[in-house]
Regions:
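Metal-cofactor-dependent catalytic cores
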Residues: 2-284
Length: 284
């Protein structure tokens, strides 16, 4: 029988940080890190780049599953974009941080913020890779995008966020994934859920009830469970959507309070610091 730490209290086992991930470009692949710096917007270099369409509106795998075919690989002071199925498209190098250049207003959900333009080469590469006109833009430190601007009770500290959907950090546990996979005909990897912080040693599903925790002594605040969408059904290696709607369909059978299918926890954290894989996670 799979081991989910059932019957144990969270305090009776050591909870540790087992994975750290950044996604330099929103809705593209992630990079696994052994350690990361904390910033006011989340992990350093996480979701600071964004792909927008001809109307300067954000693009994600929700409407463009083919974005999963654009792999992101670490490179010196930046990353490479590589198309998994089109080797004739030479990899594109991008720095983690853009240089000040032309600006434009872009829309992400209900927010309109200004961003720096990337490069003509990046725009051309992405337009060819995705089969439609698009641009790559960067969020400067001078841009303010507040977490939950219409719900200040969820953001008492005035936390800001990058181009992430809503919060600086997304946390998931290995045990919750193991519990889900035990119910699936075809198990799914953690990359379906795009977390920043992965922990092990917790009770399955327990993260949804955490009020707060610390990593290496640095405080984080759990805000609310993360409502999941169709992206979880997209194979991140092939861009093919699961015809049965899995794993979302199975998750909905036991993790659907208030009409939202939840997996993982939205989190805010300190404005500075450093975390490493293997760090202790302490609840409370």
């Amino acid at each position: 029988m799979p081991f989910y730490l059932y019957g144990m209290s969270a305090s009776s086992s050591a909870i540790t940080l087992s994975g750290i991930f950044i996604y330099p470009v929103k809705s593209l692949g992630g990079i696994s890190l052994p350690a990361a710096e904390l910033t006011p917007r989340g992990l350093r270099h996480d979701r600071r780049w964004l792909i927008v369409d001809a109307r300067n509106r954000f693009m994600t795998q929700r409407e463009h599953a083919e974005m999963a075919l654009l792999a992101v690989e670490p490179a010196y002071n930046g990353f490479l974009l590589r198309h998994r199925q089109r080797p004739e498209l030479l990899p594109l190098y991008m720095p983690f941080e853009a240089q000040p250049d032309k600006t434009l207003f872009v829309t992400i959900w209900d927010d309109m913020v200004w961003a720096w333009r990337g490069t003509p080469e990046a725009d051309a590469w992405l337009s060819e890779a995705l089969g439609q006109p698009c641009k790559l833009v960067y969020m400067s430190d001078m841009v303010r995008r507040d977490v939950e601007p219409d719900k200040p009770e969820l953001n008492p500290a005035g936390t800001v966020v990058s181009f992430a959907d809503g919060y600086p950090y997304l946390l998931a546990t290995e045990e919750s994934l193991a519990k889900l996979n035990a119910q699936l005909e075809e198990p799914v990897p953690m990359n379906r859920f795009r977390p920043n912080l992965v922990v092990s040693g917790a009770l399955a599903d327990a993260e949804l009830s955490w009020a707060g925790f610390s990593i290496a002594g640095q405080p984080f605040r759990s805000v609310r469970g993360c409502g999941r969408c169709i992206v979880t059904t997209i194979d991140q290696a092939t861009a093919q959507q699961n015809p049965a709607g899995e794993p979302l369909r199975t998750l909905a059978t036991y993790r659907k309070p208030d009409r939202k299918v939840l997996f993982g926890q939205n989190v805010t954290g300190p404005a500075s610091g450093r975390i490493e894989v293997g760090d202790a996670v302490v609840l409370g």
